[in-house]
C-alpha cells in the first residue's frame, strides 16, 4: 500500500528504485511490488463513488445495450430471432424488450452486454487520478485504470444497470 500511495502522489522519483524498498518475504521482486501497488490502485478506483457514478451516468445516457446470437442454442422456432443481433440505447429501451432479452439470455440463446465510449471513460478516470498533472508515472497509472475498468468497475456497473433495468421492467 505505501508504494500505491507513492505512485498516486505522482512522485518524480524512479519507480524501480522506490519499489525495491518494499521487497520482503511476500514481495520477492520489483515487478511484484509494482503489480501489487497497481492492483491496490485499481481496487481503489473501482470503489471510488465518483468514478462509479460517472460511469453509470455515462452508460445510462449514451450506452448501447447489444445482443448477439450464441453459436449453439435451442431456438428452433426462432422465438428470439429479433434479438440475435440487436442494439438499442440504454436510455430508450422499453420494459417488454428488456424482459424478452433477459428470457433469451436465460435460455442461452443470446449474449448481452452494454457498450459505451471506453476511451473517453478511461481518459476521464486517468485525468481524475492524476489530477490533470504531468507525471512520469502515467504509464503505470494508465495500466491501473485500464485494469480497474476492465476487471472491476465496468462489469460491476454493467450488472447494476442490467439489474435496475430488469427491476424497472
Predicted feature residues:
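Duplex nucleic acid-engaging cores and interfaces of nucleic-acid transaction enzymes
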Residues: 1-169
Amino acid at each position: 500500500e505505501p508504494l500505491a500511495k507513492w505512485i498516486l502522489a505522482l512522485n518524480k522519483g524512479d519507480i524501480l528504485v522506490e519499489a525495491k524498498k518494499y521487497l520482503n518475504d511476500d514481495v520477492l521482486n520489483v515487478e511484484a511490488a509494482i503489480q501489487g501497488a497497481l492492483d491496490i490502485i485499481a481496487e481503489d478506483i473501482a470503489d471510488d463513488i465518483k468514478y462509479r457514478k460517472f460511469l453509470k451516468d455515462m452508460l445510462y445516457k449514451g450506452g448501447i445495450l447489444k445482443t448477439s446470437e450464441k453459436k449453439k442454442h435451442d431456438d428452433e422456432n426462432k422465438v428470439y430471432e429479433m434479438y440475435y443481433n440487436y442494439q438499442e440505447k440504454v436510455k430508450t429501451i422499453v420494459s417488454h424488450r428488456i424482459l424478452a432479452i433477459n428470457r433469451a439470455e436465460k435460455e442461452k440463446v443470446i449474449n448481452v452486454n452494454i457498450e459505451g465510449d471506453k476511451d473517453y471513460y478511461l481518459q476521464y478516470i486517468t485525468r481524475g487520478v492524476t489530477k490533470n498533472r504531468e507525471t512520469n508515472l502515467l504509464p503505470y497509472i494508465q495500466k491501473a485504470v485500464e485494469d480497474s475498468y476492465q476487471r472491476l468497475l465496468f462489469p460491476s456497473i454493467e450488472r447494476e444497470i442490467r439489474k435496475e433495468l430488469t427491476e424497472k421492467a
